[in-house]
A protein has these predicted regions:
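A short, surface-exposed helix-loop junction/capping segment
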Residues: 48-54, 124-134
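Generic beta-strand hydrophobic packing signal
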Residues: 119-121, 139, 195
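Long, low-complexity, intrinsically disordered C-terminal regions of large eukaryotic nuclear proteins involved
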Residues: 132-147
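Short, structured interface segments
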Residues: 109-128
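A cross-family detector of function-defining hotspots
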Residues: 2-114, 145-193, 197-201
Length: 201
């Protein structure tokens, strides 16, 4: 008598914790020590972070992948807020979710009228004071978001990121002595990772 094949075990749900590990996995290239501390704070192993990232990539590239908005709603639940937003000629909605690892931040998805996610990144929570950004010394890893750096050191010029979840900004910023320097800042998921200063190693 032929043996029945073993029943396929249902996949465990992809949780908000898993999503936070995905955010960290992309940041580990630039700031491994910060990521390690955050991972311990979440009570997750390196293996768990890698597995979360593997499952995330599989979801993104699945033949019948969900639309980004549906995917985030399934993983993160109902958005904390949904707000109309006008960016140039583009009318869209901003969906915000809390991120327990960073209580002062929110994960924002900008959705165009056709339902396509136009942008997905971390922003400062509404009503939460942002960092004081005046000199190069203030631009420490994880200290600010893309829009905060762009406002503090305007005019800033967007730079092409090295991956879909990475952004760059070019601007000038003073050092402690007031001498201005040309800078290139790198962000992952909208959060500052490092700043390169022209003429410095």
């Amino acid at each position: 008598m032929d043996r029945m094949p073993p029943a396929k075990r249902p996949a465990t749900p992809f949780t908000p914790l898993d999503f936070q590990l995905v955010l960290l996995r992309r940041m580990a290239d630039h700031n491994p020590d910060l990521v390690e501390d955050a991972r311990h704070q979440l009570g997750a192993s390196i293996a768990a972070m890698r597995e979360a990232n593997r499952r995330w990539q599989a979801m993104l590239h699945a033949p019948r992948s969900r639309a980004a908005t549906s995917r985030y709603r399934q993983i993160l639940g109902t958005p904390e807020s949904v707000t109309p937003r006008q960016i140039g000629d583009l009318a869209c909605e901003a969906l915000l979710w809390p991120v327990p690892l960073w209580p002062d931040l929110r994960f924002e998805v900008l959705v165009a009228p056709n339902g396509i996610a136009w942008n997905e990144w971390l922003v400062r929570a509404p009503g939460t004071p942002g960092p004081v950004l005046e000199t190069l010394d203030d631009l420490t890893p994880w200290s600010c978001t893309v829009d905060e750096a762009a406002r503090a050191f305007a005019p800033a010029r967007p730079l092409e990121g090295t991956a879909p979840t990475r952004w760059g900004l070019a601007f000038t910023a003073p050092d402690k002595s007031g001498v201005r320097h040309d800078c290139a800042a790198e962000f992952t998921w909208g959060l500052l990772q490092r700043v390169g200063v022209k003429g410095r190693p």
